[in-house]
A protein has these predicted regions:
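Conserved class I S-adenosyl-L-methionine
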Residues: 1-40, 54-58, 75-78, 85-86, 141-166, ...
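Conserved Class I S-adenosyl-L-methionine
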Residues: 52, 186-252
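A short glycine-rich, Lys/Arg-flanked "PGG" loop and its adjoining helix->strand segment in the class I
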Residues: 124-139
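A short acidic, Gly/Pro-enriched loop at the edge of an enzyme's catalytic core
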Residues: 99-110
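Class I SAM-dependent methyltransferase SAM/SAH-binding core
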Residues: 46-100
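Short alpha-helix
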Residues: 168-182
Length: 252
């Protein structure tokens, strides 16, 4: 046994694939997040569950320094390579837990997490941790898959079938409620939709495996109402659907 949990195991194997993901590197949600955060040249940023570092490097040109933390060493290795190859000097990457960072109170001006919170064991605990390390009036920036009300059970089902480390994706209203309970005030909230083909959604999992079979079976059993809500192109088999992500910025 290597002692790794489901998240480390999944992303350790697929780190290289995420480095090549155009959606992660250039998704509309990333530009929306950076714009909504309004980063300043003197600010320090903590990017939680940084993965291969796309969010950290997108923010780096606008701030003093970005620290990216992640539980998966292989993802951090990819992030360091991308930063080096891109000449991004004001970023650093280290192992760290989203729900229990080592940083002191009031350390950061901005805390971000993008496309990762659905892997967190305890999202409210992460939000409390973000609140702790943020300075007064600091901003929290979140991007995560966020299914429409009424589709969350199905969306979480297929995400878990694709990736066993997926825990839960929350609706926009659930996110706003959790953020408020942690002490933040939401300043910006927008849902960004991306029409994804089955193949693009499954990536970096390869076609033809047990994951594809299980997910296609789930789609066949899905309610027609769910397919309509997700804007699914469905004729005998699902071809594409709209994957929704919330972009949320809140202030301490």
């Amino acid at each position: 046994m290597d002692g790794k949990g489901p998240t480390e195991s999944f992303f350790g194997v697929h780190a290289g694939g995420y480095t090549k993901s155009q959606s992660h590197a250039h998704g509309e949600d990333l530009a929306t997040l950076v714009d909504a955060l309004k980063p300043k040249p003197t600010e320090l940023v903590l990017d939680v569950a940084t993965g291969t570092g796309f969010t950290a490097m997108a923010l780096a040109p606008y701030v003093s320094h970005v620290t990216g933390i992640d539980v998966t060493a292989e993802m951090l290795d990819e992030a360091r390579k991308l930063a080096h190859n891109g000449g991004v000097l004001n970023v650093s990457f280290e192992l760290g837990d989203a729900q229990a960072t080592k940083f002191a109170d009031w350390t950061y001006d901005i805390v971000t997490t993008r496309r990762a919170a659905h892997h967190f064991q305890d999202v409210p605990r992460f939000l409390r941790e973000a609140y702790r390390v943020l300075r007064p009036k600091g901003r929290l920036g979140i991007v995560d898959m966020s299914p429409p009300e009424g589709t969350e059970a199905f969306c979480n089902q297929i995400e878990r079938l694709r990736d066993g480390s997926h825990i839960e994706a929350f609706t926009p209203n659930a996110w706003k409620s959790m953020v408020a309970e942690a002490g933040f005030q939401t300043q910006f909230s927008e849902v960004v939709g991306e029409q994804v083909t089955f193949e693009r959604w499954l990536y970096p999992i390869e076609l033809g495996g047990k994951e594809e079979v299980a997910v296609r079976t789930a789609w066949r059993s899905a309610r027609q109402e769910t397919r309509l809500q997700l804007n699914a192109d469905y004729s005998n088999e699902v071809k594409s659907w709209t994957k929704s992500r919330i972009v949320l910025v809140a202030v301490k």
